């Protein structure tokens, strides 16, 4: 009997782990966009007018629960919670619920950035939150939950990042570290997440996961409710979990401790793709991209060119400020068959603390668009760049196909096919790419979705004629606006 019970427990644990890697996408959709700091009402409209029609699979939204109000309203105040009331600068609970419903109705899932590791950092005196709740972080007093000093371990500072105790028990940049082994703390975190599940979300991005013991997170995840079938999820569907674990390869707390609980953010993907497209590595080395580079298995890796944190850091990571290289890197990211893909949608920043676009009363303003649909009032909206949303469509068109017919020039001109459904060529050299290449596509004329769009049977950009043998003439000039070309079966003229 004991052996049967043990086997059943192990079986259930394994099935739960696999379930938490399922993002619950509609149809062939398979790209998440992070609409960083957007208001809920604007996200709802964006789902209906742009994301749904363009085939995006889901949205990662900023933290939804009440946070401290910081002077100047820097973006990071959202990561300093003081209660689990659903009121932030992005909107209130009613607006959040309306957004989730409307996005689900057009096939766009919602994933919430959740803060389970900590509460707000120190604040002089009594802090006021975005829902009007008072707290005294310096005394570890958060009556809006309520949490008190007994719900936190003794305060200490992380001075040694190779010390597991410090990494998981001390305060990350001064933020009050919760005790996730406490029954009370666990119950409040589970209650918060279950409320979001009830409202229709598909899953969670778990902030600062490496600063929590994996066994505590496993308990919390296992205790969550199934997804809400009223929002189109099947019975017994588990929330998709992806966890922020920064692991450069030799960390005391490893990504491998979390990968079976859900997907894990693959930060080395971001760093290495930046290195390659900045010219520090030849693109020919990308043929073995993914696990060949020591990355996590594809189904366990949440992949991205940049995120809201590392786009603000110096180093190899690309961001919107290097648009030509950024678009090439994103095209490769979305074309190569590896990982669970997320693209960034930023606002403009001049320094690390720049707040989102706001009015004189420090209220977040809605994005505005020009005649081409690009954002113009402080929002960058990379997801609305044609070269990026076109590659979201490419990724949908080639889903479940393998990479084939890799070609390179021995340096930084590359091409490859996705089965017989798609083809990507990239030129990151300082001279033209002019070559007959195997596109693997059926014979015909194809619109390059990077330089233009297929509208009413006509291509507004470059086109390529594919011969009966699958070959076509590919030209990407060194002075072309974009350094890549993408063809797929849904863009056949």
UniProtKB/Swiss-Prot annotation:
Modified positions (Pyrrolidone carboxylic acid) in chain numbering: 20
Subunit structure: Monomer.
Gene: Amyrel
Sites marked Transition state stabilizer: 309
Protein source organism: Drosophila elegans (Fruit fly)
Signal peptide bounds: 1-19
Matches recorded under PANTHER family: ALPHA-AMYLASE (PTHR43447)
Catalytic activity annotation: Endohydrolysis of (1->4)-alpha-D-glucosidic linkages in polysaccharides containing three or more (1->4)-alpha-linked D-glucose units
Binding annotation for chloride: 205, 307, 342
Disulfide partners: 47-103, 156-170, 375-381, 417-440, 447-459
Chain positions recorded as Ca(2+) binding sites: 117, 168, 177, 211
Protein name: Alpha-amylase-related protein
Family from the record: Belongs to the glycosyl hydrolase 13 family.
Organism superkingdom: Eukaryota
Gene3D superfamilies, alphabetized: Glycosidases, Golgi alpha-mannosidase II
Localization of this protein: Secreted
GO cellular component, one term: extracellular region
A molecular function GO annotation: alpha-amylase activity
SUPFAM superfamilies linked to this entry: (Trans)glycosidases, Glycosyl hydrolase domain
